[in-house]
Amino acid sequence: DGSTKDTVTNLSEGAYCIVHIAHVSQSDLVTATAATLDYEHSEVSANNIALTPHSDWPLQRISNCPIAYLCKVHSTTTIGNTDQNIVFVEALELYVDDKAVTQHNGRVQVDAKAVNPLARLGASQYADLGNVFTKARPK
């Protein structure tokens, strides 16, 4: 209907937020959370999404998302003369599921295949990770 989405309304400057990276198997749930609800209704409650506290962070993260960026809102900008907004956040902390972390040569590595992030391409199109490959960096 052209009105500002609740997400943008809730993300005032200085607010805390969590950016979750969903696993490809969560595509139905991600799509379900896009349903239009009255402002006082939460998509978390409407979809029975389990939440987990994270150390001393003021917000809870989604329990079964493999990656969560714990952020503070820097600014929100309206794009052109449209009702589209972009929100800039500062990532202050990162959660990665232990099942997606490996150690190699003394370095912590995130296993991209274990995360298998859901990519939203636009409209109703999504993608999975596809092929994962390694390229040596120049010296």
Please place each PLM-identified region on the residue numbering:
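Basic, polyanion-binding surface patches
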Residues: 1-139
